[in-house]
């Protein structure tokens, strides 16, 4: 699902207030990282991810793989931080960052 510019704008404003819920280090996308990514996307829909890799090309490749494996959309990537979104068909209004910060 491709995000519209209006959605990206809204998600960026919400993402500004978020802290990273997932940190991907040198080991890349391990089973544990993928399991936590699935849990975070199911709970929060919009999450901030920190990529602890030095090289820009490595971060970009890892981010592309992360989005492909989780079937999510990249909203924004700045430096070592990325904002990732995947719609949950039945979001929990208390956990979903989209529902919680909709008024921002």
Swiss-Prot record:
Record flagged with keyword RNA-binding: yes
SUPFAM superfamilies: YhbY-like (SSF75471)
PROSITE patterns noted in UniProt: CRM
InterPro entries (alphabetical): RNA-binding_CRM (IPR001890), RNA-binding_domain (IPR051925), RNA-binding_YhbY (IPR017924), YhbY-like_sf (IPR035920)
Keyword terms: RNA-binding
All copies of domain CRM, residue ranges: 1-97
Pfam families recorded: CRS1_YhbY (PF01985)
GO molecular function, one term: RNA binding
Cited SMART domains: CRS1_YhbY
UniProt protein name: Probable RNA-binding protein PA4753
Organism the protein comes from: Pseudomonas aeruginosa (strain ATCC 15692 / DSM 22644 / CIP 104116 / JCM 14847 / LMG 12228 / 1C / PRS 101 / PAO1)
Lineage of the species this protein comes from: Bacteria, Pseudomonadati, Pseudomonadota, Gammaproteobacteria, Pseudomonadales
